[in-house]
């Protein structure tokens, strides 16, 4: 690309240069684009790639958490508005014998018994049943190895 030719072409198009000689804009091909155009295209591509990567990571973590709760029947809640629905205010964790307080992280089992999340994890390391009613947490086909995987994911 010849910058003087390009500038003369612009000036001719604006009527700033005498028109006694033939003055026209040279055709611009993809190879003649300035370097900053390449940087804009490359930067936009990187930006879109990073947004896609962030979205995929967020979506995968949501799916992993959803699959974990469906697979093991263990639901994790924070004691806020859900506590009124589960009627947990003033109740005691059967593992540590402490009352539930605001913003406590709770684990709710399929039998609707709630415990502190840390207490439940410690309990599941020893026994794979509900501390209140002794119902099994995992289905009959689940092995103790899958419960170990559950404990690894919770911690």
UniProtKB/Swiss-Prot annotation:
Subcellular location: Golgi apparatus; Endoplasmic reticulum; Membrane
UniProt zinc finger (RING-type) residues: 93-134
A Gene Ontology molecular function term of the record: ubiquitin protein ligase activity
Sequence intervals crossing the membrane: 40-60
Gene Ontology CC, one term: endoplasmic reticulum
Short name of any one Pfam family annotated for the protein: zf-RING_2
Biological process (GO), any one: negative regulation of mitochondrial membrane potential
Keywords in alphabetical order: Endoplasmic reticulum, Golgi apparatus, Membrane, Metal-binding, Transmembrane, Transmembrane helix, Zinc, Zinc-finger
Protein name: RING finger protein 122
